[in-house]
């Protein structure tokens, strides 16, 4: 194999036509966009426009409602806590605060609401500050009572 044979079998890519460089070049003046009109302007794509046909978002029925007052919890699994304890990232397992969880990247902010879920298992008793706990996490884990912030 020689350097001049490297691209021998590959199809050649057609050179793109340069736009807007005079009437003689074939794509001058309006640069293949036609005359005036919405599609001749820059940034022409109209989101959701389907050529006059009823757009999909108006054809489909409206569904659902999202409550502004609904509590949204950040989820922390007890298995993830045990992994951090095993890796010695959590030294004092008797007092795992929201500040520590935020520092370790488990939750975005110490102000976040935290719900403990039962995926995984704990090996020792742990004290965690939380707002809610699942039934499975409460039954299977060794969570201590009284540290909830709510």
Curated annotation (Swiss-Prot):
Record key words, sorted: Ribonucleoprotein, Ribosomal protein, RNA-binding, rRNA-binding
Pfam families linked: Ribosomal_L27A (PF00828)
InterPro entries linked: Ribosomal_uL15 (IPR030878), Ribosomal_uL15/eL18 (IPR021131), Ribosomal_uL15/eL18_sf (IPR036227), Ribosomal_uL15_bac-type (IPR005749)
MF (Gene Ontology): rRNA binding; structural constituent of ribosome
Any GO BP: translation
Coiled coil spans: none
UniProt GO cellular component terms: large ribosomal subunit
Described purpose of this protein according to its UniProt entry: Binds to the 23S rRNA.
Assembly mode: Part of the 50S ribosomal subunit.
Family membership noted in the UniProt record: Belongs to the universal ribosomal protein uL15 family.
Descriptive protein name: Large ribosomal subunit protein uL15
Organism, scientific name: Anaplasma marginale (strain Florida)
Gene from which the chain derives: rplO
